[in-house]
């Protein structure tokens, strides 16, 4: 029944290293579906460094980072990533999925609002659900729809609060602004935290998010912008930034 419904997963077995050409189930094929954009998976220098690290640290930390699993290699990597990105600090996770599950609930919670592209990755969707924030989906890569959804949401919330006389739950902003909207009268700005979240490059479609327009909207409404750039980091922009 699963096969008839198109829900049965066909697991491909890869023989050998990742590359432009790979052997799948005994057949050489062109690889168009891996994340090995920079060719690190089978790079001689990377493999040599990995072998040296295994000799020094073994094959794994054998513990979670917060207990006894953080090595000086983790710290060195995070420091170099921060330098690469030009930021104060970074933190690494086991996977992009884990990152979204951890980061989104740390930014928003009950009483806050997330504006999520309708084709965002499953990890973003799950992270938003875990946060317990209200989720508003906007049209794929559509800044006009995003602005309309934010305007509608903030005005509805403002009107409801004014009628009830209640103060909306407060989530202090992480950066700049008041986490409200500029087009409301002074003293009547909405205080819930607003988060706009999008993939940078959508892995299934290949679309690139219109980040300049999204950031402009975020600035206008006092929202935070979060970008999952798993498929753009190191690939797009000058020097991969």
List each model region and its residues:
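Basic, amphipathic juxtamembrane/active-site segments
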Residues: 236-241
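Conserved PLP-anchoring active-site segment centered on the Schiff-base-forming lysine
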Residues: 103-122
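Conserved N-terminal alpha-helix of the aminotransferase class I/II PLP-enzyme fold
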Residues: 48, 52-96
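Short, structured coil segments at secondary-structure junctions
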Residues: 110, 130-132, 221
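N-terminal "arm"/small-domain region of PLP-dependent enzymes with the aminotransferase-like
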Residues: 4-59, 223
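Conserved Walker B
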Residues: 119, 201, 229-231
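Active-site phosphate-binding strand-loop segment of PLP-dependent enzymes
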Residues: 136, 140-165, 183, 187-227
């Amino acid at each position: 029944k699963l096969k008839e419904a198109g829900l049965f997963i066909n697991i491909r077995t890869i023989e050998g290293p990742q590359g432009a050409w790979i052997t799948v189930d005994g057949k050489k094929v062109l690889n168009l579906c891996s994340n090995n954009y920079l060719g690190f998976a089978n790079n001689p220098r990377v493999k040599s460094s990995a072998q040296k690290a295994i000799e020094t640290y073994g094959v794994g930390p054998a513990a979670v980072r917060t207990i006894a699993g953080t090595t000086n290699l983790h710290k060195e990597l995070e420091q170099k990533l921060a330098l690469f990105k030009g930021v104060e600090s970074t933190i690494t996770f086991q996977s992009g999925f884990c990152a979204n599950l951890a980061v989104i609930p740390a930014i928003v919670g009950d009483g806050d609002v997330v504006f999520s592209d309708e084709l965002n990755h499953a990890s973003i969707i799950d992270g938003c659900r875990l946060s317990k924030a209200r989720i508003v989906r906007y049209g794929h890569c559509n800044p006009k729809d995003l602005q309309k959804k934010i305007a509608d949401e903030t005005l509805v919330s403002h009107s409801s609060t004014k009628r009830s006389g209640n103060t909306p739950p407060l989530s202090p902003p992480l950066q700049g602004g008041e986490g409200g909207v500029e087009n409301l009268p002074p003293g009547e700005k909405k205080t819930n935290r607003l988060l706009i979240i999008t993939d940078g490059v959508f892995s299934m479609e290949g679309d690139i998010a219109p980040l300049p327009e999204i950031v402009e909207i975020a600035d206008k409404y006092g929202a935070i912008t979060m970008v999952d750039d798993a498929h753009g980091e190191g690939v797009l922009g000058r020097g991969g930034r």
